[in-house]
């Protein structure tokens, strides 16, 4: 087995995430409100293409943060202020941190380009994580495709419980 070519860390690429957010704002796909920046899902007509979810079927709060700062309940966070004990970085929107989905888009662009062949992950990442990656990456990079092929694996379970680091 060979060692990986790259082992990027999200915390070392926050500058690229800030650049991507700025590009999305400039192109009209994102907006700032009270030091938060959100991706406006309704602006991306193909949202839901991977998960086969219709925009009107999305329920506010389903693994997404419900906030009065959003224009629409389905909009997802690109940048938010950090809480007192959380890591934070300086940005045009104040001290804060990037949203969960942005790190993958920024690092894949740096190491794989605007479009690449294969993207994978667990089936639990199809929505919202991979769906949001597609939206923000395609809109920021002006591409018709983010990844050509998607591979999603099921889980290993023990006593009907998902086996994962997050489970302990």
Question: What does each model-identified segment do?
Answer:
Residues 1-10:
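Divalent metal-dependent hydrolysis catalytic cores, especially in the metallo-beta-lactamase
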Residues 15-168:
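Alpha-helical recognition segments enriched in aromatics with Gly/Pro capping
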């Amino acid at each position: 087995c060979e060692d990986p070519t790259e082992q990027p860390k999200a915390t070392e690429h926050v500058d690229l995430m800030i650049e991507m957010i700025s590009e999305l704002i400039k192109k009209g796909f994102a907006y700032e409100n009270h030091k938060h920046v959100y991706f406006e899902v309704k602006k991306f007509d193909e949202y839901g293409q991977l998960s086969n979810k219709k925009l009107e079927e999305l329920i506010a709060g389903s693994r997404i943060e419900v906030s009065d700062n959003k224009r629409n309940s389905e909009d997802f966070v690109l940048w938010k202020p950090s809480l007192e004990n959380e890591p934070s970085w300086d940005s045009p929107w104040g001290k804060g941190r990037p949203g969960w989905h942005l790190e993958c888009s920024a690092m894949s662009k740096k190491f794989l380009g605007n479009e690449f062949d294969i993207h994978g992950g667990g089936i639990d990442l199809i929505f919202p994580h991979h769906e949001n990656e597609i939206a923000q990456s395609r809109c920021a990079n002006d591409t018709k495709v983010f990844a050509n092929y998607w591979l999603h694996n099921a889980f290993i379970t023990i006593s009907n419980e998902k086996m994962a680091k997050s489970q302990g």
